[in-house]
């Protein structure tokens, strides 16, 4: 089985770490390049356990020139990049009245522009090499639904989904696939603090979710793994929701 080279951003914890670990564990042909703003003990364990199959770069994704150089280095070392899971992002929780335009710019710069930068670089590289590429953006149900105090995050995710749809149509003939995976509330690294510090809001999210619980990072990783796999050969320009039924209401 030939190597499949993939990038996972925001790989240090939560959904990003669960995806990285699953891809390494499930298929020996997967070579994963992790990009995250910081390292940790869990990533060190992956480096020890998987050796050359896991390579880590420390970078914020909004360091756009640095990320471009990383992608070039990966391609020079491994060859063409087959897939990318763009998971890294930030959120802010402020009402619209208290969210100035600079905050909107900051969130959009990380969640939207930085991911467009990665996608454009991969598309251009693979067009040059006449190779397909599968790009998956981790979005959010917030991009499609209205939420109090999350307008900055919502704008960034809905804009990212708009780019995804247009790029998917534009490059489908070149065997480029672009999709979004939009989780609901997930038990990632912030979950315990959220339950403790925002109990009323946590209870509300449970009441809004038909399945009556938050999702698990591993559940999102399962879907992401399929969406960038060779088994997924006909899906592009689509947002898949994994939210316990929230958006079905």
Region roles according to the model:
Residues 12-13:
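Conserved glycine-rich cofactor-binding loop
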Residues 119, 156, 164:
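Active-site helix of classical SDR
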Residues 140:
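Residue(s) in the substrate-gating loop at a strand-loop-helix junction
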């Amino acid at each position: 089985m030939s190597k499949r080279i993939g990038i996972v951003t925001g790989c240090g914890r939560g959904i990003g770490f669960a995806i990285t670990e699953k891809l390494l564990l499930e298929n020996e042909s997967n070579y994963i390049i992790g990009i995250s703003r910081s390292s940790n003990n869990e990533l060190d364990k992956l480096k020890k356990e998987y050796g050359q199959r896991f390579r880590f770069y420390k970078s914020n994704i909004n360091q756009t020139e640095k990320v471009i150089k990383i992608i070039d280095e990966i391609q020079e070392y491994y060859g063409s990049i087959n897939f990318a899971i763009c998971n890294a992002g930030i959120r802010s929780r402020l009402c619209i009245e208290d969210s100035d335009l600079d905050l909107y710019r900051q969130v959009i710069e990380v969640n939207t522009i930085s991911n467009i930068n990665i996608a454009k670089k991969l598309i251009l590289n693979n067009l040059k090499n006449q190779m397909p590429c599968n790009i998956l953006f981790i979005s959010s149900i917030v991009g499609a639904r209205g939420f109090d105090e999350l307008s900055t995050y919502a704008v960034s995710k809905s804009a990212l989904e708009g780019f995804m749809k247009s790029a998917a149509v534009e490059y489908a003939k070149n065997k480029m696939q672009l999709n979004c995976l939009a989780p609901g509330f997930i038990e990632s690294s912030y979950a315990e603090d959220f339950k403790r510090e925002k109990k009323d809001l946590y209870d509300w999210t449970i009441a809004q979710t038909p399945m009556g619980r938050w999702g698990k990072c591993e559940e999102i990783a399962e879907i992401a793994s399929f969406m960038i796999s060779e088994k997924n050969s006909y899906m592009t320009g689509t947002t898949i929701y994994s939210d316990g039924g929230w958006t079905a209401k």
